[in-house]
UniProtKB/Swiss-Prot annotation:
Family matches, as PROSITE patterns: ACTINS_1, ACTINS_2, ACTINS_ACT_LIKE
E.C. number: 3.6.4.-
Name the UniProt record assigns to this protein: Actin
Listed GO CC annotations: cytoplasm; cytoskeleton
Record Gene3D superfamilies: 3.30.420.40, Actin, Chain A, domain 4
Lineage: Eukaryota, Sar, Stramenopiles, Ochrophyta, PX clade
Family affiliation: Belongs to the actin family.
């Protein structure tokens, strides 16, 4: 199977960003938006070779004349043609490798539909002719990256959030909570809040500007009501942001109202419980003997956990929910934006993992359903 000298590829396909690189590296080589853009208008420039589709950063930079689509929604692939374009772009343009020469480790959202997993496997073997592949759950990889095998991972990206309890390296599927509330919803909500202030953001291109505002200026308040009072009484919380056209907008309480949605989804009309509540419920669904280990190892991962103040707020909320004697530790590793990828890089380079790969021969013998037997 995988020879020691052939480097495996690790591809973490997120709803918002695709992270790709080589096993044994400590960071992904390529990080680009999971976007496919198509021209809104037919080309009129003679001699310009206009493509029918642009992927990633190129789509991002030409966003003014393109319609942008995300093929992965809520962590699950909804458009396979576009997804194939993203993988093609990953291998040939970003990493510049021939996929038929490298084993490929892919990641998936917990509770991913079975058919999706099979389709992923099929495309890898039949379209890209990879020699071997494996699919792993994102949250488990994040935990590996933090050097643990037991813990409760809150993984929140652009399209979906999950709380996943893991004991001795195994995810406990019955206790996984899935929350269709993540970075993209926060961006949409911030767009709406800014529109109320008289700044209009409507197009897919303008959404990217709002995402940038969100990433640069927002934070999680430790005490939301107190923070609202402070914001109303003075302007010390206000920050300004320069738009690409030179206009400057000022944002005040929007800075912490935006990520507050994670703790109070009712702000955007969702009936689900907040991330602190999901984490608590996940732990309560686990065996009473392992709860102590889970409470003591709550690991944050994904781009939407990058808000300043989220760790402290999480600790505060969980302390209020859990038994008073319980010691609660929320770990927010600095590299958590890429910890899924880093975990994949660690896993794919372990000598003990080499027999786990699904080989082309096994696939040819059993077909796509082999993925359920080998990857769990």
């Amino acid at each position: 199977m995988a020879d020691e000298d052939v480097q495996a590829l690790v591809v973490d396909n997120g709803s918002g960003m695709c992270k790709a690189g080589f096993a044994r590296d400590d960071a992904p080589r390529a990080v680009f938006p999971s976007i496919v853009g198509r021209p809104k208008h037919p080309g009129i420039m003679v001699g310009m070779d206009q493509k029918d589709a642009y992927v990633g950063d190129e789509a991002q930079s030409k966003r003014g004349v393109l319609t942008l689509k995300y093929p992965i929604e809520h962590g699950i692939v909804t458009n396979w043609d576009d997804m194939e374009k993203i993988w093609h772009h990953t291998f040939y343009n970003e990493l510049r490798v021939a996929p038929e020469e490298h084993p490929v480790l892919l990641t998936e959202a917990p509770l991913n539909p079975k058919a999706n997993k099979e389709r992923m496997t099929q495309i890898m073997f039949e379209t890209f002719n990879v020699p071997a592949m494996y699919v792993n759950i994102q949250a488990v990889l994040s935990l590996y990256a933090s050097g643990r095998t037991t813990g409760c991972v809150l993984d929140s990206g652009d399209g979906v959030s999950h709380t996943v309890p893991i004991y001795e390296g195994y995810a406990l599927p019955h206790a996984i909570n899935r929350l269709d509330l993540a970075g993209r919803d926060l961006t949409d909500n911030l767009m709406k809040v800014l529109t109320e202030r008289g700044y209009s953001f409507t197009t897919t291109a303008e959404r990217e500007i709002v995402r940038d505002i969100k990433e640069k200026l927002t934070y999680v308040a430790l005490d939301f009501d107190q923070e609202m009072k402070t914001a109303a009484e003075s302007s010390q919380l206000e920050k300004s942001y320069e738009l690409p056209d030179g206009n400057v907008i000022v944002i005040g309480n929007e800075r912490f109202r935006c990520p507050e949605v994670l703790f109070q989804p009712s702000f955007i009309g969702m009936e689900s419980s907040g991330i602190h509540d999901c984490t608590f419920k996940t732990i309560m669904k686990c065996d009473v003997d392992i709860r102590k280990d889970l409470y003591g190892n709550i690991v944050l991962s994904g781009g939407t956990t990058m808000f300043p103040g989220i760790g402290e707020r999480m600790t505060k909320e969980l302390t209020a929910l859990a038994p008073s004697t319980m010691k609660i530790k929320v770990v927010a590793p600095p590299e958590r934006k890429y910890s899924v990828w880093i975990g994949g890089s660690i896993l794919a380079s372990l000598s003990t993992f080499q027999q786990m790969w699904i080989s082309k021969a096994e696939y040819d013998e059993s077909g796509p359903s082999i993925v359920h037997r080998k990857c769990f």
